[in-house]
């Protein structure tokens, strides 16, 4: 919040600028709405339709109160407006990691609820410590801007290399199966990757998770439709042989994110309301029409699974040796 000091009088806010108290109240109320919507979706969709994956519901008032408390506490310090790029990631951590951990991990932790609560407390505490960085003014570091032609040359070279590896194995194809066939497509992709070089999977991941999204977001910012089209076509092609729905819907997600970031002063409440509406809409769609299409994409995959897998991870590696990076290309050094 910026203020203009006056001589001999108190500082005042710019006209139309929201007060810190008002902005904080909106963030807290938005968080309450989001947590309530996710609790509703969890009890209605995840604990019923996806119980075979490990989603459980502990019908205990004390446990439910703890989930509410741990999920809501971070809203008291979450940034209401974007002033640093990293705050976008910080909000992402809160919405799809901290809240799911506070709810799902406690309900579904293997064994007793106490271990799940302890895990959630540790995660929320670590998240709070991470947020302390925003209390420190940014250091005056000299910026060496990357020249545009250098950026495009780097993107072109890396994309050419990764697409060359991808085309050598999968060819150029746009065979879109139905969303119900993705598991067969994924199984085929996994088999191919296991029988080829590990660098193929790295090339696919870099193109799908870094380079194509970079083209899309740069195209949106600069209003260059060709860049958006190139990135989107690349994502659809990669989806056609991987079956990863995250890749398929990434273009839409980036567009929504771009629209949310256009108003950085109200980013916090906007992203809370958008995700609350998405979760509530997915739950209503399931109750009214029995469809799990949005429930699977938003409630289970995007929000629910991070909380579930966090509990599984802590439970398993609490009693077993850590893998570190022994599954990666560094296995020769780690093993």
Model-derived features: positions:
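Juxtamembrane/interface segments at transmembrane-helix termini
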Residues: 172-176, 223, 291-296
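Short hydrophobic alpha-helices at membrane interfaces in multi-pass membrane enzymes
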Residues: 222-236, 268-278
């Amino acid at each position: 919040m910026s203020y203009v000091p006056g001589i001999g009088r108190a500082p005042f806010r710019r006209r139309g600028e929201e007060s810190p108290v008002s902005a904080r109240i909106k963030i807290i109320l938005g968080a309450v709405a989001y947590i309530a919507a996710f609790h509703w979706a969890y009890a209605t969709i995840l604990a019923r339709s996806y119980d075979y994956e490990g989603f459980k519901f502990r019908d205990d008032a004390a446990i439910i109160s703890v989930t509410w408390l741990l999920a809501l506490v971070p809203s008291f310090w979450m940034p209401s407006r974007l002033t640093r790029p990293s705050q976008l990631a910080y909000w992402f951590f809160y919405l799809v990691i901290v809240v799911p951990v506070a709810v799902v991990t406690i309900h579904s932790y293997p064994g007793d609820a106490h271990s799940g609560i302890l895990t959630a407390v540790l995660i929320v505490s670590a998240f709070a410590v991470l947020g302390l960085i925003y209390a420190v003014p940014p250091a005056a570091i000299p910026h060496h801007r990357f020249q545009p032609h250098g950026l495009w040359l780097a993107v072109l070279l890396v994309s050419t290399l990764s697409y060359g590896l991808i085309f050598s194995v999968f060819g150029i194809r746009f065979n879109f199966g139905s969303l119900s066939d993705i598991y067969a497509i994924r199984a085929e992709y996994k088999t191919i990757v296991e029988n080829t070089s590990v660098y193929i999977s790295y090339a696919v991941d870099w193109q799908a998770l870094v380079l194509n999204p970079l083209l899309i977001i740069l195209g949106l910012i600069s209003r260059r439709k060709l860049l958006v089209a190139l990135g989107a076509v690349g994502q659809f092609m990669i989806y056609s042989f991987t079956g990863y729905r995250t890749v398929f819907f990434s273009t839409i997600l980036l567009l929504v994110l771009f629209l949310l970031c256009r108003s950085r002063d109200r980013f916090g409440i906007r992203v809370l309301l958008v995700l609350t509406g998405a979760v509530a809409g997915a739950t209503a769609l399931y109750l009214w029409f029995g469809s799990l299409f949005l429930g699977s994409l938003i409630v289970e995959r995007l929000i629910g699974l991070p909380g579930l897998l966090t509990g599984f991870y802590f439970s398993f590696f609490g009693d077993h040796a850590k893998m570190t990076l022994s599954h990666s290309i560094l296995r020769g050094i780690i093993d």
